[in-house]
């Protein structure tokens, strides 16, 4: 019997792979998309997250015709301001300054392209409250390095989890992949593990 279409995860994020494993989904392979993630002029955080997820899926689908391709992008926003993925100490200090003592949104766009080329997307928005950080908390977090490569400079599953005062929405989405919506996308487009 011939094997069905493969599931390709268009992400290098170990967190997304772990989240999928929690619900019994194991991608056949991982093929990260390398795209320009710079926000477009006047692009809202919602549109940005969805656009990047779909763009990542399309780039990888072109390399994997006949397979399912799953992609996601997580954006942290304070109002309409999209925070960067922190790569430097300057990035994380900027993010922490904006997040400290405020509510913000974590938006995760998910895109799935089916073997026949059909595409579907979902966007999950979660409201997150951040405590006001003391200088010692901020400096300790920066020294930890846990912020590297994270949208908005933090991961809720690490030290920064202690800064969260409130979370309204999807915890897995804040980690990097909304599981309920992702499973619905997969089944809706005919993926069967």
From Swiss-Prot:
Record-linked InterPro entries: ITPase-like_fam, Maf-like
Active site, renumbered: 73 (proton acceptor)
Gene Ontology MF, one: UTP diphosphatase activity
Q: What is the lineage of its organism?
A: Bacteria, Pseudomonadati, Pseudomonadota, Alphaproteobacteria, Caulobacterales
Reaction(s) this enzyme catalyzes, per UniProt: dTTP + H2O = dTMP + diphosphate + H(+); UTP + H2O = UMP + diphosphate + H(+)
Q: What is its EC number?
A: 3.6.1.9
* Task performed by this protein: Nucleoside triphosphate pyrophosphatase that hydrolyzes dTTP and UTP. May have a dual role in cell division arrest and in preventing the incorporation of modified nucleotides into cellular nucleic acids.
Q: What is its main location?
A: cytoplasm
Kindly give the Gene3D superfamilies that the UniProt entry links to this protein: 3.90.950.10
> What is its subcellular localisation?
Cytoplasm
Q: Where is this site: Important for substrate specificity?
A: 15, 74, 157
The name under which this protein is listed is dTTP/UTP pyrophosphatase
Query: Which family does the record assign?
Result: Belongs to the Maf family. YhdE subfamily.
Task: Cite the entry's keywords alphabetically.
Answer: Cytoplasm, Hydrolase, Nucleotide metabolism
Task: Name its species.
Answer: Caulobacter vibrioides (strain ATCC 19089 / CIP 103742 / CB 15)
Per its UniProt record, the required cofactor names are: a divalent metal cation
HAMAP family xref list: Maf (MF_00528)
Q: Broadest EC class?
A: hydrolase
GO CC field: cytoplasm
Q: Name one GO biological process term.
A: nucleotide metabolic process
């Amino acid at each position: 019997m011939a094997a069905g279409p493969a599931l390709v995860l268009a992400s290098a994020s170990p967190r997304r792979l772990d989240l999928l494993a929690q619900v019994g989904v194991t991608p056949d392979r991982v093929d990260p998309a390398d795209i320009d993630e710079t926000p477009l002029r006047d692009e809202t955080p919602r549109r940005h997250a969805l656009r990047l997820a779909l763009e990542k899926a399309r780039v990888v689908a072109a390399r994997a015709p006949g397979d399912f391709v799953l992609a996601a992008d997580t954006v942290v926003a304070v109002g309409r301001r999209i925070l960067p993925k922190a790569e430097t100490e300057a990035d994380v200090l900027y993010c922490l300054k904006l997040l400290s003592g405020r509510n913000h949104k974590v938006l995760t766009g998910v895109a799935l392209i089916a073997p026949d080329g059909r595409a579907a997307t979902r966007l999950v928005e979660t409201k997150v409250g951040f405590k006001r950080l003391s200088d010692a908390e901020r400096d300790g977090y920066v020294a930890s390095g846990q912020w590297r490569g994270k949208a908005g400079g933090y991961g809720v599953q690490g030290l920064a989890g202690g800064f969260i005062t409130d979370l309204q929405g999807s915890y897995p989405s804040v980690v990097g992949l909304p599981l309920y919506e992702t499973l619905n996308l997969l089944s809706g487009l005919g993926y069967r593990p």
